[in-house]
Amino acid sequence: MLTLFSQRHARSGARVLISATQMVTDAMEQDYVLIVEPNLTGHRWRYAEWIMQACADAGYPCMLVTECANEDHRLARQITAANRPDQQIAFVDPEERPRNRLPDPNEYWRFHRYFKRVHTIITRMQSIRLVVVPYVDYFFYSLPFLGSPFGKTPWIGITMRSTFHHHKVGIKAPDRPVVNAIKALLFKRAIRTTGLRTLLTIDPTLPEWSARSPSKHGAAIAYVADPFPDEHAENPVLARERLGLDPGQRYLLVYGAITERKGIYELVHALTRLEHAPTLIVAGEQDAGTRHFMRNHVRSLNPAPLVLDAFISNDMERDLFSACDAVWLGYKGHYGMSGVLVQAYRFGKPVIATEDGLIGWFSRRCELGPILSDLSSASIGRAITETMTSWPHTAQAMPSAREDLLSRHTLGQFKQTLLQQMA
C-alpha cells in the first residue's frame, strides 16, 4: 500500500513529499544514492530515469529529488506507481528569498543554494552515501567560490554544456576568448572541489583537452556516451502503415522537445520555397512559441506536415525513425551532443546537421549527412535536395571513427560507465 508523507519544515518552509511503502523502514535504513534534478523537461527526466535504473541494476537504493511542480510528471507517477522501497522520490521547492537577503548574483548561485537545500533536508531524514547530479551545469561554475553544496558527501556530476574548450580541439563554436579563458580557469578550480569524485561529460573532447594540462588533486574526468533508448529499425513499410503515412512519399523528421532552437522556423520557411519538398514530420512536445508559429504556418507547407505535439511513446518513436527518410539537426545555439543524432545513426538515417558544436563535429567526422554552413533557405534547400537524392551514400566500409564513437552511445554502455564511477 502506497503512503504519501507530507512534511512542512517550520524553519525552511519546504514542502517535501516522499513516496514510501509500509515496508520502507528496512530499505530506508540503508545508505541511499541521492539523485537531484529540479527540471524534468526535455531530455533531463530521461537521465534521471536511467540513473535510477542503473542503481536498481546494481542493487543501490536511490531517491530522486525534484521540484513540486513535477508531481504529475510521467516519471514521478511511474516511480510512485511502482511502489518500490528502494526507489524513492521526494519533492523540494527552492527556498523563498527573505526580504532582507540580497538576490543571488547569478543562476549558478541560485541553483547551488537549491542543491544545498535539498541535501540538507534529505540528510535529516535519510543517510546518503553518494549524490549524483545528472546536469551539473546548473551550478558548476559557482563551485570555486561556494564549495560543494553537499558538504562532505561524495558526489558525481554530468556536464553537458562545457564548451569553453571547443576552439582548442577543432569544434566550431562562438569565439569568445575572454569568456572561454575565464571558464577554463574556473573549470580547473571546480574539479578540485571537495567531495567531487568524478566529473562525467557527454563531450568526448573534454577529457582530451583536460589531459593536456591535468589539475593536481582534481576529480577524474571521464567520457560517458550520451545514450538513447536501445531500439532497432523496424520494416519501414510496416512502420509507415502504422503511422498512416504514404508509402511513396519522402519524410523529414524533426524530433524531441520542439523549440525555436531546433531551427524549426528556418526549416519551415525553406520548405515553403522548395520544389518537390519532402513531407515534414514534427514529433514531440512544443513550447508555446513554436506551437503558435506552427499554427500560423502549417497551411503554407505542401505537402501538409504531420505534427505530433505530444509526448512520444517508445513504440511510436521507433516507428518514426524507421519510417522517415532523413532527420533534421539544424539546431541553433546548441553546442552539445544530441541523442537524436545517435538515434538517427542507429536507424541508418542521414541527418541534415548544423556545422556547430558536437553535432557538427560528429556529423562531419562520422559522415552522417550534409552539413549546413548557415540556416538560410538556400542552404537548407540544397541540403534537403542532396539528402533526398544522394544519401545514404553507396555502402562502403564503415569508417572506424564512426563505429568507435557512435556504437558506444547505448543505454547499457551509459549505465556501465556510471556504475564504474559509483562503485
Residue map of PLM features:
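Glycosyltransferase donor-sugar binding loop
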Residues: 68-70, 255, 279-294, 310
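Nucleotide-activated donor-binding/catalytic signature segment of Leloir-type glycosyltransferases, i.e.
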Residues: 292-319
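A short helix/loop element that forms part of the nucleotide-sugar donor recognition site in Leloir-type
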Residues: 232-245, 393
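Conserved donor-binding/catalytic core segment of Leloir-type glycosyltransferases
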Residues: 245-262, 268-271, 281
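Short N-terminal targeting/anchoring amphipathic segment
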Residues: 103-111, 118-141, 154-157
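A charged, aromatic-enriched C-terminal amphipathic alpha-helix characteristic of glycosyltransferases
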Residues: 375-379, 389-422
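Short hydrophobic beta-strand element within catalytic cores of glycosyltransferases
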Residues: 326-327, 350-355
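A short, active-site helix/loop in glycosyltransferases that binds the activated sugar's phosphate group
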Residues: 167-168, 177-221, 228
